[in-house]
Amino acid sequence: MNMKKGVSQLTLQTLSLVAGFMAWSIISPLMPFISQDVDISPGQISVILAIPVILGSVLRVPFGYLTNIVGAKWVFFWSFIVLLLPIFLLGQAQSPGMLMLSGFFLGIGGAIFSVGVTSVPKYFSKDKVGLANGIYGVGNIGTAVSSFCAPVLAGAIGWQNTVRSYLIILSIFAILMFFLGDKNEPKVKIPLMAQVKDLSKNYKLYYLSLWYFITFGAFVAFGIFLPNFLVDHFSIDKVDAGIRSGIFIALATFLRPVGGVIGDKFNAVQALIIDFVIMIIGALILSLSSHIVLFTIGCLAISICAGIGNGLIFKLVPSYFSKEAGSANGIVSMMGGLGGFFPPLVITFVTSITGSSHLAFFFLAIFGVIALITMIHLNKKEKAIRI
């Protein structure tokens, strides 16, 4: 394996993921500004914030498969080119419908996650895959970049011009990928239906999908709803809410490689069991508290566990599915993305019915317990095989 090429492609793809996630998440931190100019109901806000997750999740399966066919270079390149259109439309949006339309196609920025997790392991030995995928996952920091920077820029130049500035960023990365992407990336051309048939018989795929539905889903969902939630429920300043949301995202992002390293050195399933116990405790804190201090503690616990859990899970995916890595990565990451779609809608619905969001966070704890049971089951089966 060419380590020099591996490092260069890992760097390029990680930075490309940053750009993609910046575009994918641009609406959420700007929503407090957008809602001042566009007449939007609370229900419409929830839908608009959740919509980018749909395409960002569903496209992860074909993107992972295409990466094995044509290589990461071309999937990244054309994704950035296509993303220019919804960014342009968002900068012109004057109605909820236009916000929804542009947000839907911004999902492409989230779908490119499966490109790197399929491509990067090809350049590294098995004992380095967890770390490499963890480093690539740091590209999730693009969400935090938007959370930190977009509100500040919007306050200075307006939210429309802030959105338009992303056209420059995406154009730069399209050019970089065109000239620096690896055109000789190893290809894997196993027929898609053959991969799906084999994967559908493996219960581990369903377990990993459930776990990632929770960990990455929490990462995405909290990043989506926190800015508006903090403003509405705790009367926090819009810029301060963006910074707090950015801290949540940054913490989870930078801990992702830590999860990968833990998975490389120790039993990843056992580490996930510990991780989920702490996450369940964090969810229970959120479900039982209304004070900003306790809410912050619960959010930090969720952030830490989501980040480490994401890294651990994507250590396991290439280990369990080496021949079907592209499709498996796509399916698992798709489920993670979908995990971020439902919580904002559930929180809005529960709050409208009960007057409080507590029950919604309790649902997260319940899902965590279900996942914990499956982890214990898998750990017992693997122990029996080792014996």
From Swiss-Prot:
The answer to whether the entry has keyword NADP is: no
Transmembrane spans: 14-34, 45-65, 69-89, 97-117, 137-157, 161-181, 211-231, 246-266, 268-288, 294-314, 330-350, 358-378
Note the SUPFAM superfamilies from the entry.
Answer: MFS general substrate transporter (SSF103473)
Can you say where in the cell this protein is located?
Cell membrane
Give the source species: Staphylococcus epidermidis (strain ATCC 12228 / FDA PCI 1200)
Protein name in UniProt:
Probable nitrate transporter NarT
Which terms are listed as keywords in the entry? Cell membrane, Membrane, Nitrate assimilation, Transmembrane, Transmembrane helix, Transport
Induction of this protein: by what? Answer: Positively regulated by the two-component system NreB/NreC.
PROSITE patterns for the chain = MFS (PS50850)
Q: Which gene encodes it?
A: narT
Q: What does this protein do?
A: Probably required for nitrate uptake under anoxic conditions. Also possibly involved in excretion of nitrite produced by the dissimilatory reduction of nitrate.
For this entry, list what GO says about its biological process. Answer: nitrate assimilation
